[in-house]
Amino acid sequence: MNQKLLKSQTILAICILILSIIPIVAIGPYLHQFADDYVFGAPVYKAWTATHSLGACIQAAWDESMHIYQTWQGTYSACFLMALQPGIFGKYWLVPIILLGGLVLSTYTLGYTVLRRLLHISKLEYAFVSTLFVLMTVQFVWSFYDAFFWYNGAMYYTLYYSLSLFLASLLIEFHLTKSIMAKIIITLVSAALAIFIAGGNFVTGLGMPAILFMAIVWMWVERKKTPFFLISILMIYASAFAFSVFAPGNAVRQATVTDQPNVVAAFFMAIGKSVEFLADAIGIMEVLMFTILIPFLARLAKASRFKFSHPWLYLLISFLLYSAFFFPNSYAM
């Protein structure tokens, strides 16, 4: 592609992204706490007003997380963050900045890891493609309120999605770097992120290890390698996720559900929901954006050193992995 044209398109895409973000951030000062923001934040608010000690607030947030773990839900790290909602400190305007910033940064990071480090495209091409993906991720969310403005609900999903992208970047980078020190740091950070993400919502909680498991299988089948690093991270993740799933509070909450499908029924329900969601989510604008990306993606696929002997099988697996994100709500809610 003509480099001058690509540069102009990249600058235009970045300008559109910035302009589209400004209104989201500008709404921040007009936001206020709502619903579960008060429920989870009350103990920390009491600690803050009584002591103005950050340490006391962190302790109160942890105590609240463990209380919820025993009485309502096992998502230990999410409940900890919910208890520390910014409104306690009079900073609720930070909510869209935190959530939007995490989403933008994590998407660019994963894009850099895949496009630059793995596929070796130019910086300009990376900037253009990644910016379009960031623009789509931000502007095509199902609900701006639930994605960026309500801390309790948005943090539960948007932030944990962003953390998952960071973790994916680290897992890929581990296999690309030659530095022993970098591998050690990546291992420690990846393990910490795995434990933290596993304590979040069950949608991300189940979807992320499913993708990780298939990455391990792919390396076994296609590369004839045993990915001990990925296996170790998956084991850490699975242990932490089990701690969340088998929380006493989950049994209490599940007792309030009167009609629960079996695993097989939930599996097909998840597939149905994924198809329904895709049908609702893909419109003319989404199609247009992907059409713009087709020349780049086609060239990347052609130049890639990765070979897929059974492309339709990979497409099917990708769809099933996508459906896995709908399984927790189909089975337990």
Predicted regions and their residues:
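Start-transfer (signal-anchor) and selected internal transmembrane alpha helices
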Residues: 1-22
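Membrane-interface alpha helices of multi-pass inner-membrane proteins
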Residues: 185-202
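Membrane-interface micro-motifs in multi-pass membrane enzymes
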Residues: 125-172, 284-287, 322-333
